[in-house]
Amino acid sequence: MYVVLEGVDGAGKSTQVELLKTRFKNALFTKEPGGTRMGESLRHIALNENISELARAFLFLSDRAEHVESVIKPALKEKKLIISDRSLISGMAYSQFSSLELNLLATQSILPEKIILLVIDKEGLKQRLSLKSLDKIENQGIEKLLTIQQKIKTHAYALKEKFGCEVLELDAKESAKNLHEKIAAFIECVV
């Protein structure tokens, strides 16, 4: 089963992934972008080089294609539980070029069965971002991140409607423990 955690920077995805690692010890944990060695290189170029938005979008699509081919497909073949920190959903939300068709090509139409959305309000986001050093994307501001969050939700629910992906939307301001229990129950109801 292929499960993804989605949310903007500061929503608590990384915290939840770490908690899930203790609970699902046999699962394959991965991330997008950068879930492969090639992906890390592409991610570095996309985030650090002065390139066009279109070129950046294709770098992330290349990363996604390699990630699905070399990580996701083999794990699905072995019937492993795959838990990914982000997926094509974030890829489409963060990009100015959010073509579902190109993403379906890159993923070979392999989509997550379960999508966990961590949603945070403006005040919660401000508070969390004040506690960490900000990267290039986070430095674009709270309003930009809230716009991206809305796009993440839109893309997740579009996948639910078009392809039957299950979606669990959670308030990221809940305690990490409560969120973990809800996420684990959502994953376990099929595992």
Curated annotation (Swiss-Prot):
Please name the GO terms that the record assigns under molecular function. Answer: ATP binding; dTMP kinase activity
Binding residue positions for ATP: 7-14
Reactions accelerated catalytically: dTMP + ATP = dTDP + ADP
Keyword Transferase appears in the UniProt entry: yes
Q: Which domain of life is it from?
A: Bacteria
Instruction: Could you list this entry's UniProt keywords, alphabetically sorted.
Output: ATP-binding, Kinase, Nucleotide biosynthesis, Nucleotide-binding, Transferase
The terms describing its cellular component in GO are: cytosol
Q: Extract the CDD domains matched here.
A: TMPK
Q: What class of enzyme is it?
A: transferase
Q: Name one GO biological process term.
A: dTTP biosynthetic process
Tell me which EC number(s) this protein carries. 2.7.4.9
Role played: Phosphorylation of dTMP to form dTDP in both de novo and salvage pathways of dTTP synthesis.
Q: Which family does it belong to?
A: Belongs to the thymidylate kinase family.
Protein name (record)? Thymidylate kinase
Identify the species of origin.
Answer: Helicobacter pylori (strain G27)
What lineage is on file? Bacteria, Pseudomonadati, Campylobacterota, Epsilonproteobacteria, Campylobacterales
Q: Which gene encodes it?
A: tmk
